[in-house]
């Protein structure tokens, strides 16, 4: 079954004794290369003599042509034969397979990097479920214990049943309250408008709109003693499409798994801020960071129908609270009529366990700047088969590694070092990437150029979707103009053309939409904590016509290879396009003589964000005046940044690229700009989110928020206990933001 990985001699040999950046690796990969290469190659030879772009002018074209859709298809098939739950033998075996294949592909160094982190598993002998009990305490209904197996997978026995990872154990019972999506505003509606108290109740919420961990946190704050999560057809069933296996919709018994943590970037709950290695100090389980305090369990919509059909109490406040089930969506509390004495009971027996996980880290050393790292990473662990999440991304990473290895075997090397990562335990709170970044944080802060995330390659087949730092906007726009669009009706046109038409920006007329980085994926620690420029790209659905959350079969047993091959991307042309985008981003970042970062795009973004947060504040004009709140300092800092960025850009245009010292100075200014937005003290209550310009929303981890410190200070400010103190905090956050932008501008000034 899903037994946690046991320590073994082979695990030790491949794992802890091969920790990445160990002394031997440093000597092999960096000490000799850096000292000799820097002294002789950097100062004696012109910097562009040894770059691949000069030696092999067609290498970028060769790289893109070498990427093959059929290889991605083959890799995806291979990666989805068995489940790969973090901490299990299957996932360890896949790590060893990737380790061996990356070596065969030709990387200079491939190692396993292991950590002992807190994971969560269901109890095999005491399954989790939800029941309805009558007044005598007898069960009259219980939810399904497992999903039906998809065709062709009936004989695979190690499928973990649906559960909410890190839910505490417990058997709470009580009246049921329907809380819509369990968002902050939903609980405000219940408590402030409808006067419904959730304290001591069991609440049921539909998946969607916000991260499930935020739902659980909101339920806790409302006093609930348990929460049930379900996938409503309105959010996970597209009209006109059949359910799996005949289509890509969610069957009634399909269930979304997922963690319900609120880590806020802490990493392993027992070692927040520090790597979970062999000598790490670990908190007691009772002191673990980010764990929920109330039992949680997910169910499918067939079971949800049974729980909701006899709900009594208040009618839903408006149509936005109604889903796609044939129930009235009454809020409760409790059942109606003859069912009024029945209660709902959770039976949760999951357990937490310190378990070993394994990242795979591959290195392709740079020829000119081996001490500058461009990182491509995506996770490998899956809740079950992971047909989309994550293996559609892992297969693309595998093909990109193979392609870079092919070029290397022909004598090519990138200018800068490229690191490739197959992360473990992403589904349990981004643990693999966070622990590795924590272990190597000092090196990464000094040498990290960029991080490109490579989770799911598709969540639809409509158009490109990009989230990234403004530093990468121009890079993405330029490279998509060079790539062909895979979309029907855009034959002979560029990816940029189809992207711009299908997903236009709401902020910048005539440009495609690029979104802010939030969280919920492995770029978090690199961007939000370390300040390394980051980006991600994948193919997505038509969000205008398709209102479902994510894709319907997300984190269910039905996320199979066949789902992708039959319904989403039969020819794998969209996977290939995503490989080209991700690969080209890495290629440009690792190979361009001048880093392809655009600080002027950052200036434009800062101006937009400052205007947006100011407009939000002006919802309170009287208070702004009474408490003498001014945004003048922030707007002044943004104007200064804009002026300095313009002058910096002019120096880039005039740069003598044959002068290695000047080249290094300007590249370092570009590389460290993102770092300049990092506040070591972090955001209020979220010390591991340190980026002052961007952070995950406090109310939805998946979404990005600009000037998050100011935004959070303003949120629901009229209902704060101490209004005067709340407005002083707004003033403080404005000053922090203004200082940070001004300080960042200073890093771009010409070095005297």
UniProtKB/Swiss-Prot annotation:
Widely expressed throughout brain regions with highest levels in the hippocampus, dentate gyrus, priform cortex, choroid plexus of ventricles, pineal gland, anterior lobe of the pituitary gland and supraoptic nucleus. High levels also found in the cerebral cortex, substantia nigra, pontine nucleus and the granule cell layer of cerebellum. Highly expressed in astrocytes and non-myelinating Schwann cells. Also expressed in kidney, localizing to the proximal brush border of the renal tube. Residues 1-19 are cytoplasmic. InterPro entries: PA_dom_sf (IPR046450), PA_domain (IPR003137), Peptidase_M28 (IPR007484), Peptidase_M28B (IPR039373), TFR-like_dimer_dom (IPR007365), TFR-like_dimer_dom_sf (IPR036757). Glycans are attached at residues 48, 78, 123, 155, 197, 338, 461, 478, 615, 640. Binds 2 Zn(2+) ions per subunit. Required for NAALADase activity. Residues 276-589 are annotated as: NAALADase. Its cofactor is Zn(2+). One of its GO terms (biological process) is protein catabolic process. The modification Phosphoserine is found at residue 10. The keyword Calcium applies. Residues 45-752 are extracellular. Ca(2+) binds at residues 271, 274, 435, 438. It is a single-pass type II membrane protein. The NAALADase activity is found in the central region, the dipeptidyl peptidase IV type activity in the C-terminal. Belongs to the peptidase M28 family. M28B subfamily. This is Glutamate carboxypeptidase 2. It comes from Rattus norvegicus. The lineage of its organism: Eukaryota, Metazoa, Chordata, Craniata, Vertebrata.
């Amino acid at each position: 079954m899903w037994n946690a990985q046991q320590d073994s001699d082979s695990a030790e040999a491949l794992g802890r004794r091969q920790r990445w950046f160990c002394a031997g690796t440093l000597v092999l990969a960096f000490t000799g290369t850096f000292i000799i290469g820097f002294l002789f190659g950097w100062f004696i030879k012109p910097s562009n003599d040894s770059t691949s772009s000069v030696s092999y002018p067609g290498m970028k074209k060769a790289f893109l042509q070498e990427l093959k859709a059929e290889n991605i298809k083959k890799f995806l098939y291979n990666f989805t034969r068995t489940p790969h739950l973090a901490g299990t033998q299957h996932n360890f075996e896949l790590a060893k397979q990737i380790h061996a294949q990356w070596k065969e592909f030709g990387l200079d160094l491939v190692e396993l990097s292991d950590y002992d982190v807190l994971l969560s598993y269901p109890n095999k002998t005491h399954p989790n479920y939800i029941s309805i009990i009558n007044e005598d305490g007898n069960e009259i209904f219980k939810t399904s214990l497992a999903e039906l197996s998809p065709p062709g997978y009936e004989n695979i026995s190690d499928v973990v049943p649906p559960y909410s990872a890190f839910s505490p154990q417990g058997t709470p019972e009580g009246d049921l309250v329907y809380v819509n999506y369990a968002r902050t505003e939903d609980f405000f509606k219940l408590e402030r408008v409808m006067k419904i108290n959730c304290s001591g109740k069991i609440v049921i919420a539909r998946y969607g709109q916000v991260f499930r961990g935020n739902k659980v946190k909101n339920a806790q704050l409302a006093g609930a003693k348990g929460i049930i999560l379900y996938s409503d057809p309105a959010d996970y069933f597209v009209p006109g499409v059949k359910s799996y296996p005949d289509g890509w919709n969610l069957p009634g018994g399909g269930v979304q798994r997922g963690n319900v943590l609120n880590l806020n970037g802490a990493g392993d709950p027992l070692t927040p801020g520090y790597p979970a290695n062999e000598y790490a100090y670990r908190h007691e389980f009772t002191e673990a960071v980010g764990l929920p305090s109330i039992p949680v369990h997910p169910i499918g919509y067939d079971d949800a129908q049974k729980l909701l059909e006899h709900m009594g109490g208040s009618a839903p406040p408006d149509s936005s609270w109604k889903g796609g089930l044939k129930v009235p969506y009454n809020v409760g509390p409790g059942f109606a009529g003859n069912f009024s004495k029945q209660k709902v009971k959770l039976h949760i027996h999951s357990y937490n366990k310190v378990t070993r996980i394994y990242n795979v880290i591959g290195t392709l050393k740079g020829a000119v700047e081996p001490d500058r790292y461009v990182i491509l990473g995506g996770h490998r662990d899956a809740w079950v088969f992971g047909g989309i999440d994550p293996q559609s991304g892992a297969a693309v990473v595998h093909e990109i590694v193979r392609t870079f290895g092919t070029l290397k075997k022909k004598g090519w090397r990138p200018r800068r070092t490229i690191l490739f990562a197959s992360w473990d335990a992403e589904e349990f709170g981004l643990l693999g990437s966070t622990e590795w970044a924590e272990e190597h944080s000092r090196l990464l802060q000094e040498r990290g150029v960029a991080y490109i995330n490579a989770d799911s390659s598709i969540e639809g087949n409509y158009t490109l979707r990009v989230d990234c730092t403004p530093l990468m906007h121009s890079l993405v726009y330029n490279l998509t103009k060079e790539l062909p669009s895979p979309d029907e009706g855009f034959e002979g046109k560029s990816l940029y053309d189809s992207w711009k038409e299908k997903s236009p920006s709401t902020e910048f007329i005539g440009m495609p939409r690029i979104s802010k980085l939030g969280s919920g994926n492995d770029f978090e620690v690199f961007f939000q904590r370390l300040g390394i420029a980051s980006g991600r790209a994948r193919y997505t659905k038509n969000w205008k016509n398709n209102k479902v959350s994510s894709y319907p079969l997300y984190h269910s047993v039905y996320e199979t290879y066949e789902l992708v091959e039959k319904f989403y991307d039969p020819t794998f042309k969209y996977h290939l396009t995503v490989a080209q985008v991700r690969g080209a981003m890495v290629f440009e970042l690792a190979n361009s003589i001048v880093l392809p970062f655009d600080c002027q795009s950052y200036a434009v973004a800062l101006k937009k964000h400052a205007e947006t947060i100011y407009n939000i504040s002006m919802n309170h004009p009287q208070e702004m005046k009474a408490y003498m709140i001014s945004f003048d300092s922030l707007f002044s800092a943004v104007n200064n940044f804009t002026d300095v960025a313009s002058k910096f850009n002019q120096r880039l245009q005039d740069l003598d690229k044959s002068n290695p010292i000047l080249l290094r100075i300007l590249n370092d200014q570009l590389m460290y700009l993102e770092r300049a937005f990092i506040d070591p003290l972090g955001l209020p209550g979220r010390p591991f989110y340190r980026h002052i310009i961007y952070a995950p929303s406090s109310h939805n981890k998946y979404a990005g928020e600009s000037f998050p410190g100011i935004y959070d200070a303003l949120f629901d400010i009229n209902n704060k206990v101490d209004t005067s103190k709340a407005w002083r905090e707004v003033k403080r956050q404005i000053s922090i933001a203004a200082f940070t932008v001004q300080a960042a501008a200073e890093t771009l000034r010409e070095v005297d």
